[in-house]
């Protein structure tokens, strides 16, 4: 079987089908509005700048910030921003990774947590004069209700087919 992030992997095909289904329904004006959103947000705080990106400062699909990446890979993707903390998602797993140049915080996933725990996850970052306080929380969510609504609307199944 192809690696998970390979376009030929069954999960990628299932994701692509859902993505196309969504694009067909939201229409061009919403697609353009989403495309016009900034790729990053920067907030200046007492703890230093917080940079918020989807995956990394390099791009929306960059995979260099995962817990399995080497320090050199992480530094190549995230260093040089001048931020004291960088918040990102894309991995669908909550974690905090202190780096020499900044505190890296994966803020998690509400709908598809990949750690096997069927709980929505979110992160609260609080800036203090002493640095950052990171609270990563899990809460229950009605996954069955969401899946029922998806089926009723004809959204392709998330389960991959070989």
Where are these regions (language model features)?
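Active-site neighborhood of phospho(di)ester-bond hydrolases with catalytic His/Asp-centered motifs
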Residues: 53, 84-90, 104-108
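A short acidic, helix-capping loop that chelates divalent metal ions and anchors anionic groups
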Residues: 1-3, 59-62, 145-146
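Active-site neighborhood of divalent metal-dependent phosphoester bond hydrolases
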Residues: 1-42, 49, 64-82, 156
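A short secondary-structure junction signal
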Residues: 53-56, 60-67, 97-99, 116-118
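Short, acidic/polar N-cap/turn motifs at the starts of alpha helices
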Residues: 38-42, 93-94, 122
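Active-site environment of divalent metal-dependent phosphoester hydrolases
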Residues: 1, 58, 85-98, 112-115
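Acidic, His/Gly-rich catalytic cores of divalent-metal-dependent hydrolytic chemistry
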Residues: 97-162
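Short, structured loop/turn "capping" segments at alpha-beta junctions
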Residues: 41, 45, 85-87, 132
